[in-house]
C-alpha cells in the first residue's frame, strides 16, 4: 500500500474480512485486504490458505490483524503485512521484517499517531479495528484526528466506510469496506 499522488482518483479501496466468518469471494477490487484474525482462529488454516491464494491471484496485499486484546502474533507465512495495535511494542518487528507492511491501529491521540508514523508504520487505520461491526469501527473513528493527519502527515491513512462509494470530505488515501 502506498500513497498515490493523483488527487482526482479518490481513495484506494482496502477490503475488510474476518477469518472464519467472511466467505472467500471470487474476486477482489481493492489494493489490500485486512484479514481480522479473531482468537481461536488457528484451526482455520485452510481458510487462511484460501485468502492467501486469492490475494496473490488478485495482486492484493494481505494484511493480518490479530484482533483479540493481547493476542498479537507474528504474521503467518504468505502474507504481506500485519496490523500493530502497539507500534512502540512492535518496533523491533520493523527491523526484523523490513519488507512487511505494518498498519498501525488503536490510535487515540495525535501523539500516538505521530509515534506510530515515526516508528515505521506504513499506514494508519483510524477506527476501531477490533470492533465486531462496521458501525463499531466507524464509532471509533476520530475524524478530526484523521483529517489533521491527511493534511499534515506523509504516512497514508485508512478510514472505515460503509461502501466503496463513500469518500470522506478530508480525502484519506484509503477507505476500508467490509466484504459481504
Task: Label each region the model flagged.
Residues 65, 157-163, 177-179:
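Glycine-rich beta-strand-to-loop/alpha-helix junction loops that act as flexible
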Residues 104-106, 127, 145, 154-165:
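Glycine-rich adenosine-cofactor-binding loop
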Residues 100, 132, 141, 151-157:
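Short acidic, glycine/proline-enriched helix-loop-strand junctions
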Residues 1-80, 95-108, 114-121, 138, ...:
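Conserved N-terminal beta1-alpha1 strand-loop-helix module at the mouth
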Residues 35, 81-93, 123-137, 164-180:
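Glycine-rich phosphate-binding active-site loops on the catalytic face of alpha/beta enzymes
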Residues 140-145, 175:
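Short, glycine-/small-residue-rich phosphate/pyrophosphate-handling segment
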Residues 53-54, 145-152:
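C-terminal EAL-domain catalytic cores of bacterial cyclic di-GMP phosphodiesterases
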